[in-house]
Each structure stands twice: as C-alpha cells, then as structure tokens.
C-alpha cells in the first residue's frame, strides 16, 4: 500500500451523495489530479476484518469559492478587475472531483464509497484497479501492452488481455477518430508489433492480413521509420523493440494491361516481397453475387449460376443437345465458348429453354459472367492464371498486405469477399498454417455501414464479428465515425480505442455514457493519445502509445517513388528479375522472339507463381514453340499469256 501523504479526502453531501459506482473528493489547488487520473481510497473502518480499498478514475472536476453570486465579486472590486489584486484576503477556493469506480476490494459486500483518504495511484495500484493483476501473473501471463498511463508522476504500462483481444473469451478491436489527427493507422501498426512481441507461445501462432484501401499507408511496413527518444522510451517501457516488421508480404492485382502490378509499392528496390494477385474462373465463380446486381439477377439467374458452378466448371460436361461433345470449362474463355455452343444449339432446335432455363436467362447470365474478367481486368484473367495468398502455408508473425487502394469498388469487394472467406474456411479446418489471424480493415463505416443495402461484404464482416473469435479470426477495424458502423460489428468488438474525436460524432447517442469532461478531453487529444475500453476495465482509460518504428506512407512515397511506365519488355524483365537478378534484356528478347504478348504474359505469370530455381529454363519452357516452314525449291508459276503484237496498251 502507498504510504505517501493523502492528496485529498472523500466528501459527500445530500445533493451529491456517494454511491457504489461513483464518489466525490476534494484536493488542494496544487494537486496533480486531472481528468483520467486514477486514485485510491482507503476506507477508515474495516469491513469483515479488511480495510476496504476503492479505485476510481476522475471523470469530472469542479472549482468553488464562497461567493453566492458573481455580482458580489464585481462589487468588491468596484467594477475594476485591477482592484481585485489589492484585496486584503484571497477568497477561499476548493477543487472538487468526481470519480467513477474501477474496482472495490473486497468486492463483496458492494457498498457506497466510504469517507476515506484519497491517494494518487502508483504502478501497482494501476494494475490492481484495472484487474491486470489477474493476467500478468508469472507462468500465465497473457498481457499485450497497449501504451503507457501517465498522471501525477505515476507511469505504468497498460496491458490488454490476449484472451479478450484475440479470443476465445472475446475478440476484435475498433479504433475511431478524425482523419489525420487520431493516428488510427499508427495505432494499429503499434498493436500488431505489440501482439507479435508479447503474444504467448502457448496460445499458438499469429499472423495479420491487412487491406491497404487508401494511398500508401501500409506500403512500407518493412522499412524503418524515424522515431525520437520519447518514442524509444515508450517502446522500452512496453517491452517492444523499435523495429519495423521483419516478415511482410505484399499482394496486388496487375493493371489492366496485365503487365505492371497495380500498387504504390512499385519501386524496383522493393520488389523482392511483392507478388501479383490474380484469379481465374474457379476462384471467382463462388463469389459471383458480389459483382452481380441483385435487382437485375433474379432467382432464375441464381439457379443457372449454381448449375454452372456445380455441374459445368471443372467437370466433363456432356449434353445430348450439344451432340454429347465433352466440354471442360476451367477459364472464362472456355466458359464463353460453352455459352456460345449452348445458345447455338437452342436456336437450331427453335426451343425457348434448355434444362428448364429460359433462353433469356441464359443470355443474361452469359453477359453478367463473361464480362467479369473485363470489369476486374488485372485481377481476373480469361486464361485462369492463379497467383494467390499462401493459404495453408501462412507463417507465424508475418504481415500479409493486400493493396487495393487503386482498384475499382467491384474489384475491392471481390478481394475482400474471397480472402476473408478463404481465411475462415482454412481456420475451420485448422490448416491455414497459423492459429490466429488479425484481419485489419480500414474505413469500416464504408464496408460495414449501419444503413444501406445488405451487401455480401457487410454480411461477411458481420459473420466475422459474431463468430470469428471461436475460429481465431479477429477483426481490427478503423473508422472515422463509429456511430455509422453496423451495431453488431461495433457491439461485438471487445476492445475499443478512441483518438481525437469530432464534436459531431461525440454528440451521437453512443457517447452519452461519457461525462462531459471526458468528451472534452477526447475532442482535444494529442497525436499518440488514446482512450481505451476493454472488458477488464470498468471505465475508459487514457494512455499514450509510441510512434511505430515503421516508415510512414507519405515518407515512403517520397523515398521510394513509383516506377515510371516502361515498355512491355522492360516490365516483364523487371518482374522476372525479382527471382533472378542476373537476367538481361538481351536474353529476354531472344527468348521472346516473335511470341504473342498474351503468351509472354502467360509464361511470366506461370514463372512468378512457381518461382523455379532455374528461371531462364522454366520461362522458356512456358513459351509455345514457333514452327517455321521449311524452305523448299520454288515452283515455277504458270507463264503469263502474252498480248497481241499490235496491242496499243502493251509494254
């Protein structure tokens, strides 16, 4: 117990009584107490033989004098503020604070806070007040540092319980704040570093999948950033090395030309861990509803899509109307040929339907499906080339960044839907490669809004929020307006972080439980400050976290500018050089010869997917052999018949 002199005493009046969850106390004018300060009350009378101790956090402050009316002060100074300095005595002023109870010891019986001495909480008191002592025990330590609490000279690292952050007891995290000032992205980067450092080995392995949805925010996580000594001290206090992420893999689709990867991380010096993200018909068809307009595609069209998915794709398909010819559909190009044969056969027989599917429905579905590769060019290929995340081979403490910042909304939705669904499927089978996955989604109020149509992506995020913790799939979401996020997504987040908040957002009903002084502090937080809500904390706590030791997006964009647009040959060579730096333009030109551009792209994609030991040999083996005609003796042609001797137009 702290033996220091008390800084105040609990006080209660009939108008302001103390309760089991709230109490009031007064302090001296020089007391280091402010909004968010944690204090301890020592009761004067033992309860069941134990001196009660009550811990609380300050949520409101008041200042009083003995004035009955402001008019009395004006009259005493004759209306001149300067005369107040010459008053024979100073007016008595007191500071009165209101604190919300964090914890009672003993917890039973639960009684109103007694009239005891108030002490500033020390480091041990902070741990007890926030119930961190229960999960910071040696041998069963599950604490993940979130930041440092500082107030009145007390400094204490604040820990979250891994069982309530990554499951299975509770899970998910959301961070809210205004753009640019709330440091939402930095907070998530810091949390991932902290998790990778402190997540107990006994709990299994953990990885992160992050969607970069705007600018270069997450494009340089493996590059060191500049931090000052204050940030280094905070890193040391939390036991997290000030280093960038050691294992990061980047994925992005190609641009529409199918040659250059569509990412802001295109500098040649950073290409060793950048891989293309491309899918074919098999990978996309399961998520066709993401790209189809529900107002346009009815139940009949859905039935035909299900038929194609279950009976046609990746199967030997025969039909009497098609002459029992075998169709094997594995790509969008082969799907288009299948549709063409079906429609031609139906037209020849003058039928209006085929296998209960009307011709109009077949044409509609054909138009909707076969243009997916055009709408999502660069991501979806006609030929069916696949380059994907390493599902089944995820590595521990690795960050997988999927850059979708430069993509259209349709392509973004398709990527979200497929990757999250695949993560869930593999975690259910326990064959992903890791036990836990942190899924970071920025702009959560866009992808899981509280109003608007019930999209596939929103339903998927709702499912993750409600059932993901049992699988080890944990959602980390960032948004500017928490009030606009779907209630079931926000409500299922066990931990909530708040940076600087907008006054309009604070005026919404979701923040009505906060005291006015706490709202005022939220609206003026500095960068690096957060308000934290966690299942073990009965009241919000203010902490400061360090700037992550990774390069910020805008700094990386300046230091590693995007690669300039280059010729087709140069783009192919630049990609292949990430596997074999010894490749030359002369070799590539000789290998390409007179090959078609589509064939070269196909060979390049296969090489990047397989990553062979001998890149030269493998790439050349993927190119189609060029058959040249043999040079034989030239046949003599039929002689031209000569014209009349006296032809006036002859030569």
For the regions a language model picked out, list residue spans one by one.
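Conserved ASCE P-loop ATPase motor domains encompassing nucleic-acid-directed helicases/translocases
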Residues: 1-138
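Conserved nucleotide-binding/hydrolysis micro-motifs of P-loop NTPases
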Residues: 30, 62-64, 105-106, 214-218, ...
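P-loop NTP-binding catalytic core
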Residues: 111-172, 556
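P-loop NTPase motor domains
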Residues: 199, 203-206, 210-211, 215-221, ...
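Conserved ATP-driven motor cores of ASCE-family P-loop NTPases powering translocation/secretion/packaging/pilus
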Residues: 237, 456-457, 462-549
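Conserved P-loop NTPase motor module
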Residues: 528-598, 602, 624-651
